[in-house]
Amino acid sequence: ANMNAVIFQVRQGGTAYYESSYEPWGYYAGYQNPGYDPLAAAIEEAHSRGLELHAWFNVFQTSSTHDGSPAAEHPEWICRDQNGIPMSSYRSLSPGLEDVREYTINVAMEIVRNYDIDGLHLDYVRWNEHTNSQRNNPTVDQELERLDGMINKNEIEYLISNMSGRYLYDYQHPYSAGVPDGFISWEEWWRWSVTTFVKTLH
Protein backbone atom coordinates (compact mmCIF):
# COMPACT_ATOMS: atom_id res chain seq x y z
CA ALA A 1 0.00 0.00 0.00
CA ASN A 2 2.91 2.34 -0.80
CA MET A 3 4.06 2.20 2.81
CA ASN A 4 7.61 1.60 4.00
CA ALA A 5 7.66 2.57 7.68
CA VAL A 6 5.67 2.52 10.90
CA ILE A 7 5.82 5.35 13.44
CA PHE A 8 5.29 3.79 16.88
CA GLN A 9 4.80 5.94 19.97
CA VAL A 10 7.30 4.85 22.61
CA ARG A 11 7.09 7.78 25.03
CA GLN A 12 3.98 9.75 25.93
CA GLY A 13 3.83 12.49 28.54
CA GLY A 14 6.69 11.05 30.58
CA THR A 15 5.50 7.44 30.39
CA ALA A 16 6.72 4.49 28.32
CA TYR A 17 5.44 1.81 25.95
CA TYR A 18 8.54 -0.35 26.29
CA GLU A 19 10.57 -1.87 29.13
CA SER A 20 11.97 1.35 30.60
CA SER A 21 14.26 1.64 33.58
CA TYR A 22 13.41 5.35 33.82
CA GLU A 23 9.66 5.81 33.42
CA PRO A 24 6.40 4.01 34.25
CA TRP A 25 4.15 2.25 31.79
CA GLY A 26 1.78 4.58 29.97
CA TYR A 27 -1.96 5.12 30.10
CA TYR A 28 -2.74 2.81 27.17
CA ALA A 29 -0.89 0.00 28.96
CA GLY A 30 -2.97 0.62 32.08
CA TYR A 31 0.08 2.02 33.88
CA GLN A 32 1.32 -1.54 34.30
CA ASN A 33 3.37 -4.12 32.46
CA PRO A 34 1.04 -5.55 29.80
CA GLY A 35 2.85 -8.88 29.88
CA TYR A 36 4.98 -8.22 26.82
CA ASP A 37 7.15 -5.45 25.40
CA PRO A 38 5.01 -3.44 22.93
CA LEU A 39 8.00 -1.82 21.22
CA ALA A 40 9.86 -5.11 20.78
CA ALA A 41 6.70 -6.72 19.39
CA ALA A 42 6.08 -3.82 17.01
CA ILE A 43 9.66 -3.95 15.72
CA GLU A 44 9.41 -7.69 15.09
CA GLU A 45 6.09 -7.35 13.25
CA ALA A 46 7.27 -4.41 11.16
CA HIS A 47 10.60 -5.94 10.17
CA SER A 48 8.96 -9.27 9.31
CA ARG A 49 6.94 -7.35 6.72
CA GLY A 50 9.86 -5.40 5.31
CA LEU A 51 8.86 -2.20 7.09
CA GLU A 52 11.04 0.17 9.08
CA LEU A 53 10.04 0.93 12.67
CA HIS A 54 10.61 4.51 13.82
CA ALA A 55 10.22 5.39 17.49
CA TRP A 56 7.94 8.37 18.15
CA PHE A 57 9.35 10.14 21.22
CA ASN A 58 7.61 12.97 23.09
CA VAL A 59 10.54 15.06 24.33
CA PHE A 60 9.64 17.77 26.84
CA GLN A 61 5.87 17.25 27.11
CA THR A 62 5.11 15.56 30.45
CA SER A 63 1.36 15.58 31.04
CA SER A 64 1.36 12.47 33.22
CA THR A 65 1.82 12.77 36.98
CA HIS A 66 1.63 9.02 37.53
CA ASP A 67 4.08 7.63 40.09
CA GLY A 68 7.53 7.41 38.55
CA SER A 69 6.91 9.97 35.81
CA PRO A 70 9.29 12.95 35.65
CA ALA A 71 6.52 15.41 36.56
CA ALA A 72 5.76 13.40 39.70
CA GLU A 73 9.36 12.72 40.66
CA HIS A 74 10.73 16.16 39.78
CA PRO A 75 7.96 18.80 39.93
CA GLU A 76 10.69 21.46 40.05
CA TRP A 77 11.48 20.64 36.40
CA ILE A 78 8.08 21.86 35.16
CA CYS A 79 8.01 25.14 33.20
CA ARG A 80 6.82 28.24 35.05
CA ASP A 81 5.17 31.51 34.18
CA GLN A 82 6.39 35.02 34.92
CA ASN A 83 5.17 34.75 38.50
CA GLY A 84 7.01 31.48 39.11
CA ILE A 85 3.84 29.38 39.02
CA PRO A 86 4.36 25.95 37.40
CA MET A 87 2.09 24.58 34.70
CA SER A 88 -0.85 22.63 36.11
CA SER A 89 -2.05 21.09 32.84
CA TYR A 90 -0.45 20.23 29.50
CA ARG A 91 2.77 20.19 31.50
CA SER A 92 6.17 20.58 29.90
CA LEU A 93 9.64 20.11 31.33
CA SER A 94 11.98 23.06 30.92
CA PRO A 95 14.56 22.61 28.15
CA GLY A 96 16.53 25.31 29.98
CA LEU A 97 17.43 22.95 32.83
CA GLU A 98 20.57 20.88 32.38
CA ASP A 99 19.08 18.10 34.54
CA VAL A 100 16.08 17.89 32.21
CA ARG A 101 18.22 17.71 29.09
CA GLU A 102 20.48 15.03 30.60
CA TYR A 103 17.57 12.95 31.89
CA THR A 104 15.69 13.10 28.59
CA ILE A 105 18.79 12.14 26.62
CA ASN A 106 19.25 9.13 28.92
CA VAL A 107 15.66 8.04 28.25
CA ALA A 108 16.11 8.42 24.49
CA MET A 109 19.43 6.56 24.48
CA GLU A 110 17.88 3.69 26.44
CA ILE A 111 15.65 3.11 23.41
CA VAL A 112 18.39 3.61 20.84
CA ARG A 113 20.76 1.17 22.58
CA ASN A 114 18.26 -1.54 23.50
CA TYR A 115 15.99 -1.73 20.47
CA ASP A 116 16.55 -2.27 16.75
CA ILE A 117 14.71 0.87 15.70
CA ASP A 118 15.27 2.47 12.30
CA GLY A 119 14.74 6.06 13.41
CA LEU A 120 13.93 8.28 16.38
CA HIS A 121 11.29 10.96 15.80
CA LEU A 122 11.42 13.86 18.25
CA ASP A 123 8.02 15.37 19.04
CA TYR A 124 7.43 18.35 21.36
CA VAL A 125 11.12 19.21 21.05
CA ARG A 126 10.37 22.81 21.96
CA TRP A 127 9.20 25.08 24.71
CA ASN A 128 5.52 24.54 25.40
CA GLU A 129 2.72 27.10 25.65
CA HIS A 130 -0.32 28.22 27.67
CA THR A 131 -1.45 30.94 30.01
CA ASN A 132 0.96 33.77 30.63
CA SER A 133 -0.47 37.08 29.49
CA GLN A 134 1.97 39.44 31.20
CA ARG A 135 5.10 39.14 29.09
CA ASN A 136 5.97 42.38 27.28
CA ASN A 137 5.85 42.05 23.51
CA PRO A 138 6.68 44.27 20.55
CA THR A 139 3.77 46.20 19.13
CA VAL A 140 2.12 44.99 15.96
CA ASP A 141 3.60 47.92 14.03
CA GLN A 142 7.10 47.10 15.30
CA GLU A 143 6.72 43.49 14.21
CA LEU A 144 5.38 44.51 10.81
CA GLU A 145 8.32 46.86 10.31
CA ARG A 146 10.79 44.15 11.31
CA LEU A 147 9.23 41.61 8.95
CA ASP A 148 8.87 44.17 6.16
CA GLY A 149 5.32 43.19 5.38
CA MET A 150 6.00 39.50 4.80
CA ILE A 151 2.85 38.55 6.72
CA ASN A 152 -0.31 40.51 7.43
CA LYS A 153 -1.36 42.33 10.59
CA ASN A 154 -3.85 39.66 11.70
CA GLU A 155 -1.15 37.00 11.56
CA ILE A 156 1.20 39.18 13.61
CA GLU A 157 -1.48 39.76 16.26
CA TYR A 158 -2.05 36.01 16.47
CA LEU A 159 1.66 35.31 16.88
CA ILE A 160 2.03 37.93 19.62
CA SER A 161 -1.05 36.64 21.45
CA ASN A 162 0.25 33.07 21.26
CA MET A 163 3.71 34.05 22.54
CA SER A 164 2.27 35.96 25.48
CA GLY A 165 0.44 32.82 26.58
CA ARG A 166 3.47 30.63 27.12
CA TYR A 167 5.26 29.25 30.15
CA LEU A 168 8.85 30.06 29.24
CA TYR A 169 10.78 30.06 32.51
CA ASP A 170 11.87 27.66 35.25
CA TYR A 171 12.98 27.64 38.87
CA GLN A 172 16.63 28.26 37.95
CA HIS A 173 15.78 30.90 35.35
CA PRO A 174 12.83 32.92 36.70
CA TYR A 175 11.48 35.84 34.74
CA SER A 176 12.19 38.10 37.72
CA ALA A 177 15.95 37.43 37.44
CA GLY A 178 16.11 38.77 33.90
CA VAL A 179 17.73 37.27 30.83
CA PRO A 180 20.19 34.48 31.79
CA ASP A 181 23.87 35.46 31.84
CA GLY A 182 25.61 35.18 28.51
CA PHE A 183 22.50 35.79 26.40
CA ILE A 184 21.18 38.98 24.87
CA SER A 185 17.50 38.02 25.04
CA TRP A 186 15.13 35.39 26.36
CA GLU A 187 14.52 34.31 22.76
CA GLU A 188 18.21 33.55 22.29
CA TRP A 189 18.26 31.49 25.48
CA TRP A 190 15.11 29.56 24.51
CA ARG A 191 16.63 28.69 21.13
CA TRP A 192 19.98 27.77 22.69
CA SER A 193 18.43 25.39 25.22
CA VAL A 194 16.54 23.35 22.63
CA THR A 195 19.41 23.37 20.12
CA THR A 196 21.82 22.22 22.84
CA PHE A 197 19.55 19.29 23.66
CA VAL A 198 19.30 18.17 20.03
CA LYS A 199 23.03 18.55 19.38
CA THR A 200 23.92 16.59 22.50
CA LEU A 201 21.48 13.79 21.69
CA HIS A 202 22.76 13.60 18.14
Q: Where do the model's predicted regions map?
A:
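Solenoidal tandem-repeat scaffolds enriched in leucines and small polar residues
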Residues: 116-121, 177, 184, 188
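Short, solvent-exposed turn/loop segments enriched in Gly/Ser/Thr/Pro and often Arg
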Residues: 9-14, 57-61, 123-128
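Structural preference for beta-strand elements that scaffold enzyme active sites
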Residues: 5-7, 50-54, 90, 118-121
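Aromatic-lined substrate-binding rim segments of carbohydrate-active enzymes
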Residues: 12-58, 181-202
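Extended hydrophobic secondary-structure segments
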Residues: 112-129
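Catalytic domains of carbohydrate-active enzymes, especially glycoside hydrolases
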Residues: 1-15, 114-119
